[in-house]
């Protein structure tokens, strides 16, 4: 595990550790740390956290190369590089780039990171390809796609096998990733949740996304079928990585990232929000 001893890192950890409980985290967004560096560290097995304070990126390592999930903003790429290098790894050893969904805070820097890696393969869920290609790159780069994924397809590198699950709603191609890792002689199921249901989401009468309510309902149903040991996500407020990292740094056992109850609470809260939003918006649909 790589832990920063700098005062800045300690202040960041202390500040983020007071994030809301998992039962409420889904609806409380804190974007103040999106562009702030956070100590890279081992989560479990061959899974490492290399994101910022509230935008989460994950590295799955192997002797054959690494898989990166989420590149985030172009302006946060220096933080990503530093996070990877502090683990004793190289950007050029990243062979595959994946994403949670086609929003700039998770995939804007994909073209830039592909160049830095020397040509890592970029893979995107089919339904998100149009939105991903339309992402504005501040540096003017064209977003690349080397492989288009379908629901249930697997991405393999070395001994790592990641399965892409279509969980639409946040975007049409919102992708939840699952895998199994080994740690301490045991197997652990890992899930990286794609995106949550915002408390101000327009589910009824959404002209830009007419299927959004049904898509979220389908995704909630699918999320209920998963039983992960390790719950990760694209945003920090879903699962409190700062608090878990702080406890992990102090030698807490079992590993604080083992949190099946936190995952179940997140799914239950999403379903509760969906029911409330649909009921409320049916009473007052948007004006034509």
List the model feature ranges, each with a label.
Residues 1-11:
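Bacterial N-terminal signal peptides that target proteins for export
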Residues 9-21:
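Bacterial N-terminal signal peptides
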Residues 23-25:
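Boundary at the C-terminal end of the N-terminal hydrophobic targeting segment
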Residues 33-87, 176-197:
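Conserved beta-strand hairpin/beta-sheet module of binuclear metal-dependent hydrolase folds
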Residues 46, 60, 70, 101, ...:
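Divalent metal-coordination and catalytic microenvironments
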Residues 66, 73-75, 145, 154-156, ...:
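Metallo-beta-lactamase
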Residues 75-78, 85-154, 266:
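Active-site HxH/HxHxD metal-binding segment of metal-dependent hydrolases
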Residues 260-288:
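C-terminal regulatory/interaction regions
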């Amino acid at each position: 595990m790589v832990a920063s001893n700098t005062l800045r890192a300690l202040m960041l950890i202390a500040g983020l550790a007071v994030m809301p409980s998992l039962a409420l985290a889904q609806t409380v967004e804190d974007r103040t740390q999106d562009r702030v560096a956070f100590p890279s560290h081992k989560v479990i097995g061959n899974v490492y956290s290399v994101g910022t304070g509230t935008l989460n990126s994950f590295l799955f390592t192997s002797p054959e190369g690494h898989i990166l999930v989420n590149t985030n903003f172009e302006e946060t790429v220096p933080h990503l590089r530093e996070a990877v290098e502090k683990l004793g790894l190289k950007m050029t050893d990243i062979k595959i780039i994946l994403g949670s969904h086609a929003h700039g805070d998770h995939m804007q820097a994909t073209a830039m990171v592909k160049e830095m890696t020397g040509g890592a393969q970029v893979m995107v869920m089919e339904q998100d390809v149009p939105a991903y290609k339309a992402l504005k790159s501040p540096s003017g780069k064209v977003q690349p796609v080397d492989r288009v994924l379908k629901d249930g397809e697997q991405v393999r590198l070395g001994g790592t096998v990641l399965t892409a699950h279509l969980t639409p709603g946040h975007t049409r191609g919102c992708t939840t990733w699952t895998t199994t890792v080994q740690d301490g002689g045991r197997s652990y199921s890992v899930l990286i949740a794609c995106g949550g249901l915002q408390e101000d989401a327009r589910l009824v009468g959404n002209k830009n996304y007419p299927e959004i309510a049904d898509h979220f309902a389908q995704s909630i149903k699918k999320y209920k079928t998963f039983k992960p040991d390790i719950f990760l996500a694209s945003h920090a407020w879903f699962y409190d990585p700062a608090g878990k990292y702080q406890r992990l740094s102090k030698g807490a056992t079992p590993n604080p990232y083992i949190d099946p109850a936190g995952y179940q609470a997140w799914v239950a809260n999403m379903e509760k929000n969906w029911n409330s939003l649909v009921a409320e918006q049916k009473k007052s649909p948007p004006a034509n």
